[in-house]
Amino acid sequence: LEENQDQIKIITSNEQICSKYLICCAGLMADRVAKLLDIKINFQIIPFRGEYYRLKKHHNSLVKHLIYPIPDPNLPFLGVHLTRMIDGSITVGPNAVLGFKREGYKKFNFSIKDTLGFLSFRGFHNVLKKNFRSGVYEMKNSLFKRGYLKEVQKYSPQIKLNDLKPYPAGIRAQAVLEDGTLVHDFLFAESRRSIHVCNAPSPAATSAIPIGKYITEKATKAYNNLT
């Protein structure tokens, strides 16, 4: 990315695109992309893997709605919950496990660059101090399926270990401030010709349309101020 007085250039290995203004939703790479435009930021994106299971089909009639635990108000994670999908199947999850690769969707994916990146970040050390016990607990439940099951059985005790079947994981792009704060709200970074969505917690998907409208309004105002 290159920004000058007249435009922004998006340079890829195949082409170069010029634009008057850029709206960037880079997810797991949001902080790195913002830095490409020399935007000063006080946070880093740290990946948290959300692991799910799917229940066996005979449990499809178990719930008709979402069932959530009471979340920890100090953490931006909603906890393991039951979700009835569009096709009628039931998923369980997600947990929130520290990921060692930004785009590592498998349990043991690892990136030296990504891991060294957060290990050298002061904010991560502060997160660890504040949330060490809960972090170890999440890691244990990730490695040992019975621990995960106990979380589910708190509000659905009839579910057994062999009812939990594999299901794809997701990665949460969690913005962490230098003081160790896990950002609970939406976070934006801006340059003269760009706006970057750097943190989009729940209910980002549910509220996608009004959030999109909000971003568009901010971008339109910034663009109009250029002329």
Predicted features by range, described:
Residues 107-109, 113, 117-226:
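C-terminal catalytic lobe of FAD-dependent flavoproteins
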Residues 1-110:
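Flavin-dependent oxidoreductases
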